[in-house]
């Protein structure tokens, strides 16, 4: 039968240590297959965040309801009017896939796999992130560093190899202000 693939494309809102990355929605029966990860690597995707619970993203819906190989993709931040080399490699790889050609990445090649260790949720108007406003996605977080405070609650890094993802102080109360992510192997230790 025909293989359904859905790549929900986004442009990065901030600089990132991983130029391009994907978010793999959780679905019953497991996460991304090795061949899907190899395809992403061939599309210049550096990392894949594997979700461990359901979400309300477009890619989660197409994966669940339509059985699609679905990912949300965060593409490299543009500088001026020029496309980044990673975006051009992504575009060329996507054209090759549409034309039925094989991508150049080997079957064993995979992007870095990550998972969410913790979410930082804004609980009150006193919430503040204690990291630089211009911090890059996937910037490493030293153990013991203070990430956020909110009405007596403190988020302190206790995960080895932790990185920050999607830090946003100006979200509504009850919303996610940041994610702490770790390499997949680290989360299983």
Where do the protein language model's features map onto the residues?
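Structured catalytic-domain cores with a bias toward divalent-metal coordination
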Residues: 1-189
């Amino acid at each position: 039968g025909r293989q359904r693939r859905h790549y929900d494309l986004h442009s990065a809102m901030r600089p990132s240590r991983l130029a391009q990355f994907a978010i793999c929605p959780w679905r019953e029966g497991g996460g991304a297959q090795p061949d899907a990860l190899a395809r992403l690597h061939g599309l210049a995707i550096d990392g894949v965040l594997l979700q461990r619970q359901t979400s309300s993203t477009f890619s989660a819906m197409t994966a669940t309801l339509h059985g699609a190989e679905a990912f949300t993709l965060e593409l490299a931040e543009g500088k001026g009017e020029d496309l980044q080399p990673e975006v051009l490699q992504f575009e060329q790889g996507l054209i090759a896939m549409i034309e039925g050609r094989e991508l150049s990445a080997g079957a064993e090649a995979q992007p870095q796999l990550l998972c969410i260790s913790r979410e930082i949720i804004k609980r009150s108007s006193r919430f503040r992130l204690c990291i630089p406003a211009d911090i890059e996605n996937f910037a490493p977080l030293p153990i013991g560093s203070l990430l956020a405070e909110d009405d007596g609650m403190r988020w302190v890094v206790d995960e080895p190899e932790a990185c920050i993802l999607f830090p946003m102080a100006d979200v509504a109360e009850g919303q996610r202000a940041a994610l702490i992510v770790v390499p997949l192997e680290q989360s299983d230790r």
